[in-house]
């Protein structure tokens, strides 16, 4: 798999249609853009145990509201460091790491919700997922700039 992701193996054939690249980039942005829907998660998170009404052990809104800003901070940090790394390893490797972080962050955050461990929600969705978001923003932009230097 490492060979498939290496920078040397991402050269497209001469007859490759470059208009496939924006379609793939939009698909990536649609996936990672779901982070901006965080506000729909907040009310149900305050009723994890109580389901219909808030139970005594449920999280407060003030406890879960900071998950989104944590994700955005780590988005910025990851994007800042990813630019140089992308130049070294190529956009394909960065995209795969993005998918693993974003998907893995969702899974860890989900485990935190099921087990009622707030720190897992922050770690998964906020930190790991946020890093995946940052990587996800850098890779398509870099690829589009290279495929469309005339635009």
PLM segments and residue spans:
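Intracellular juxtamembrane helix-capping segments at the cytosolic ends
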Residues: 45, 126, 132-149
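Primarily marks hydrophobic transmembrane alpha-helices of the MFS/SLC 12-helix fold
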Residues: 92-95, 121
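C-terminal ends and interior cores of transmembrane alpha-helices
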Residues: 100-115
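Paired small-residue
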Residues: 105, 116-127
